[in-house]
C-alpha cells in the first residue's frame, strides 16, 4: 500500500488546495473522504489532460479579464478627474464624509461602467479639495484616480 496517493481536486478543499490542483494525500483520506464525496478524482492520463485543458481555459479567461481591466484603467486615466458634490458647513468642512460608494457612483456616471464599491480605497476626506483614490480593477491592475470634492 503506498504511503501517499495523487488526486486531482474537483473543488476547493480547505487546507489542501483549490479546484484543479494535483495533490498528494494519505490513501485513507482519499478513499474515505475525498473520493466518496466527489471532492477529488484519482490521477489518470485522461484526468490530467482534462486538468491541463481546464487550466488553459482559465488562463485565457484571466488574460481577458486583465486586458479588460487595463483598458478600463486607460479610460479612467483619460477622464482625468472625477467630481463628488457634498454639502458643507463652515470652512469647507463636509457634513459626513466621502465614501467609496460616492466615488463608485462618480466613476459610474462618468464611464457608464459599474464598479464594485469594495474595490475602491478612499482616504478619510472631511474637507473639500483634491484627493488621490486607489481603485482595484483586477488582482494585478490598480488605478490611481484624481477625486475632487466640491460643495453644492
UniProtKB/Swiss-Prot annotation:
HAMAP family hit by this protein: Ribosomal_bL9
Gene name for this UniProt entry: rplI
Cystine connections: none
Annotated family: Belongs to the bacterial ribosomal protein bL9 family.
Alphabetized Gene3D superfamilies for the sequence: Ribosomal protein L9, C-terminal domain (3.10.430.100), Ribosomal protein L9, N-terminal domain (3.40.5.10)
Residue ranges crossing the lipid bilayer per the database entry: none
Keyword Ribosomal protein carried by entry: yes
Cellular component terms per the entry's GO annotation: ribonucleoprotein complex; ribosome
The protein, known as: Large ribosomal subunit protein bL9
GO molecular function ontology, one term from the record: rRNA binding
Biological process, per Gene Ontology: translation
Keywords: Ribonucleoprotein, Ribosomal protein, RNA-binding, rRNA-binding
Signal peptide range: none
Coiled-coil zones: none
A Pfam entry, by short name: Ribosomal_L9_N
Alphabetized InterPro entries for the sequence: Ribosomal_bL9, Ribosomal_bL9/RNase_H1_N, Ribosomal_bL9_bac/chp, Ribosomal_bL9_C, Ribosomal_bL9_C_sf, Ribosomal_bL9_N, Ribosomal_bL9_N_sf
The keyword Ribonucleoprotein appears for this protein: yes
